[in-house]
Amino acid sequence: MKHSATSSEAHARATWPLPEPTLAYFPNARFVPSDRDLDAGAARPIRGGVAVVDDSPDFGHVPVLLERCVELLTPALTRRHPDGSGAVLLDATLGAGGHAERFLADLPGLRLIALDRDPSALEIARERLARFADRITLVHMRYDGIAAALTESGYAATESVDGILFDLGVSSMQLDRPERGFAYAQDAPLDMRMDPGSPLTAADILNTYDEAELADILHRYGEERFARRIAAQIVRRRAKEPFTSTADLVSLLYQAIPAPARRTGGHPAKRTFQALRIAVNDELDTLRRALPAALDALAVDGRIVVLAYQSLEDRIVKRLFAQAVASRTPVDLPVELPGHEPRFRALTHGAGRADAAEIERNPRSAAVRLRALQRTQAPQATGKGD
């Protein structure tokens, strides 16, 4: 293990430790577990107030529902040739490259186009996938840029891809690096940007948005029932001193959330941190734009798999997938009109879940919801009334 301090981490040391009353309800601030560790009980020690990150090749990343993803996508990737020759897999959220590595290893003829908004993740994945360098194209881009990424890679934006994978949410690499500011269990700058080049940070939101905007973000993106109370206290607190670290926010949440609520329903900071992260990274609107583009990119008989880890994302996926598999024949007609059949069919009944064995190996998989579709019809086969 190794760790070199940055200026932001030096700030984290300076504000460490959190006050003991806060630690009473935020005990993980002393030890920082990785939610993708194989050992559910493993914890990363704090040295000088900074979590030490294991520099292993996979950075602790354990691909979620890997076998199920392979089972669902492989038929589309091997329909031309058993080794994947002629097939293209689009990984819209590459991360550490765990899912992509498996497909590339299993299918020596497969080509991969992979996107990630985080340049650090791309570099990690580039190293991990180096032995497949002649078959991969890595693109620094948010996943709502699928059409542009395909065009830049020499493919059409529509009907050119055989398989698509989305593994949504924040990655373990981002959670495990204190300077990124994603985790409420460690003191760090209030950043939360998945792309460090993006202009908006969590501190910007906390220090500049008005009370109504803050309450709306906490309620809409975090489903936080104490959103108004928290927003009011944020505004009062920043009038005295701006928010700079996650410890500042954790301390405020300890004061704002009633004691009974702090003791039940999971970590009391979870909803606020989720809301800020979603707002900083525009995650939900990005997903709303990305999924239609992904469906357009699929060739006939191509397949898409989406892994979502929180209900707001899963609702978007569920709604858009339901629209994709619906007939376009007017509901008052008794028969299906030619050319109005659904363009997609569902490959899962509801949302797929991890089993107990996988959850024990990989605790992050407990939250996952998997949904998958197959394209059955090309857009140009539809009627004029579409």
UniProtKB/Swiss-Prot annotation:
Pfam families: Methyltransf_5. GO terms for molecular function: rRNA (cytosine-N4-)-methyltransferase activity. Keywords: Cytoplasm, Methyltransferase, rRNA processing, S-adenosyl-L-methionine, Transferase. Its EC number is 2.1.1.199. One of its GO terms (biological process) is rRNA base methylation. Its main location: cytoplasm. InterPro entries: RsmH, SAM-dep_MeTrfase_MraW_recog, SAM-dependent_MTases_sf. It is found in: Cytoplasm. Gene3D superfamilies: Putative methyltransferase TM0872, insert domain (1.10.150.170), Vaccinia Virus protein VP39 (3.40.50.150). GO terms for cellular component: cytoplasm. It catalyses: cytidine(1402) in 16S rRNA + S-adenosyl-L-methionine = N(4)-methylcytidine(1402) in 16S rRNA + S-adenosyl-L-homocysteine + H(+). SUPFAM superfamilies: Putative methyltransferase TM0872, insert domain (SSF81799), S-adenosyl-L-methionine-dependent methyltransferases (SSF53335). NCBIfam families: 16S rRNA (cytosine(1402)-N(4))-methyltransferase RsmH. Specifically methylates the N4 position of cytidine in position 1402 (C1402) of 16S rRNA. PANTHER family: 12S RRNA N4-METHYLCYTIDINE METHYLTRANSFERASE (PTHR11265:SF0), S-ADENOSYL-METHYLTRANSFERASE MRAW (PTHR11265). This is Ribosomal RNA small subunit methyltransferase H. The gene is rsmH.
